[in-house]
From Swiss-Prot:
Record-linked PANTHER family: UPF0178 PROTEIN YAII (PTHR35146:SF1)
Pfam families tied to this protein: DUF188 (PF02639)
Sequence similarity: Belongs to the UPF0178 family.
Alphabetized InterPro entries for the sequence: UPF0178 (IPR003791)
Name used for this protein in its record: UPF0178 protein CTC_02403
């Protein structure tokens, strides 16, 4: 079991590494070549820049039981289909019970924006998001290790 991170725009990396190091779990952070990441714990993998390039590499490398951290519902749906776990950087767990609704809401929001309407932006990251990410990541690590 590993933690794979869609790290291009992923807040909370310090909490991910904290939870992983406490549980001796490998972390691989994926980003495109236009970003620079540094970590003394995680392996950093750079991929070519391009639309969905990081997502496609993660989908190709994920294995059953891995944990994927991403804000992207589409990526979450794909890795859930491969038997992996998925969580977003604010600590919300994606699962087979909520992913269809999230994808539908994303689709509807896109339609509203394309027709000139307005949708709500996500709220700013708060300390409680780091706490939720850490706690739910610990939960998923325990679940994946069973």
């Amino acid at each position: 079991m590993r933690i794979l991170v869609d790290a291009d725009a992923c807040p909370g990396k310090h909490m991910i590494e904290k939870a992983a190091s406490e549980n001796n779990v490998e972390v691989i952070m994926y980003c495109d070549i236009n970003h620079r990441l540094e970590s003394s714990y995680s392996e950093i993998k750079y991929v070519e820049s391009g639309f969905q390039s990081v997502d496609m590499v993660i989908v190709n490398e994920v294995k059953k039981g891995d944990i994927v951290i991403s804000q992207d519902y589409g990526l979450a749906a794909l890795v859930l289909g491969k038997g992996a776990y998925a969580i977003n950087p604010k600590g919300y767990i994606y699962d087979n019970d909520n992913i269809d609704r999230l994808l539908f809401e994303r689709h509807m929001s896109g339609k509203i924006r394309r027709s000139g309407g307005k949708t709500f932006n996500p709220r700013k990251r708060m300390e409680e998001d780091d706490k939720r990410l850490y706690e739910n990541l610990i939960f998923l690590i325990g679940k994946a290790k069973k």
